[in-house]
């Protein structure tokens, strides 16, 4: 049963950012680059007016309100990405075998992990840059989902199964997500 007559979520467009909406495809241009994303859901309208992006739905149900707020969050992340960008930081941890990490093309190569002869590989998604400085890895880009997925790929490449993780703590771990430190 609808409670409200409509849901209207607004996102301010900052200076230096250009947002266009055509057929539920939102394009955001800013100083760091350009992002494009299709935000499609039945009955949800997205348009720009008075320097704002508006997500609108008439006679919403609970799920419609959730979708409108999700679209608002996606648009906020796109705007933040093209203005500031996103950065994830990872730390290489090892106790006995020194791990070597290097970037080669669109892959991160992890050598000598737990003394293994074959290197482990993690995929770098397009539009994301990875820098390795000693025991710190920095993942940067304008698309929050691609940056987060690349950091997760690197972390998962060194995941240890069959051994007690409390004892064998070797690996690569995310220590900072999009500027916020991780609490362990």
From Swiss-Prot:
TM region positions: none
Recorded superkingdom: Archaea
Keyword tags: Ribonucleoprotein, Ribosomal protein, RNA-binding, rRNA-binding
GO molecular function, one term: structural constituent of ribosome
Record-linked SUPFAM superfamilies: Ribosomal protein L6
Example of a GO biological process term: cytoplasmic translation
Gene3D superfamilies with a match to the protein in the record: Ribosomal protein L6, alpha-beta domain
Any one GO cellular component localisation term in the record: cytosolic large ribosomal subunit
InterPro entries cross-referenced by the UniProt entry: Ribosomal_uL6-like (IPR000702), Ribosomal_uL6-like_a/b-dom_sf (IPR036789), Ribosomal_uL6_a/b-dom (IPR020040), Ribosomal_uL6_arc (IPR019907), Ribosomal_uL6_CS2 (IPR002359)
Purpose: This protein binds to the 23S rRNA, and is important in its secondary structure. It is located near the subunit interface in the base of the L7/L12 stalk, and near the tRNA binding site of the peptidyltransferase center.
Assembly and oligomerization: Part of the 50S ribosomal subunit.
NCBIfam families attached to this UniProt entry: PRK05518.1 (NF004037), uL6_arch (TIGR03653)
UniProt record similarity statement: Belongs to the universal ribosomal protein uL6 family.
Name of the molecule in the record: Large ribosomal subunit protein uL6
Species this protein is from: Thermococcus gammatolerans (strain DSM 15229 / JCM 11827 / EJ3)
């Amino acid at each position: 049963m609808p409670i409200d007559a409509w849901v209207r979520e607004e996102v301010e467009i900052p200076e230096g950012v250009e947002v266009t909406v055509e057929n539920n495809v939102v394009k955001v241009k800013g100083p760091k680059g350009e992002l494009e994303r299709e935000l499609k859901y039945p009955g949800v309208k997205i348009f720009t007016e008075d320097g704002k992006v508006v997500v609108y739905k008439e006679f919403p149900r609970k799920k419609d309100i959730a979708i409108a707020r999700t679209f608002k969050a996606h648009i906020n992340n796109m705007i933040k990405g093209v203005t500031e960008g996103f950065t994830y930081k990872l730390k290489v941890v090892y106790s006995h075998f020194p791990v070597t990490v290097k970037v080669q093309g669109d892959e991160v190569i992890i050598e000598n992990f737990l003394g293994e002869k074959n290197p482990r590989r993690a995929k770098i998604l397009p539009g994301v840059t990875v820098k390795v400085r000693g025991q710190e890895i920095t993942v940067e880009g304008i698309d929050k989902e691609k940056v987060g997925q690349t950091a997760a790929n690197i972390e998962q490449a060194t995941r240890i199964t069959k051994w007690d993780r409390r004892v064998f703590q070797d690996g690569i771990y995310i220590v900072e997500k999009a500027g916020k430190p991780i609490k362990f």
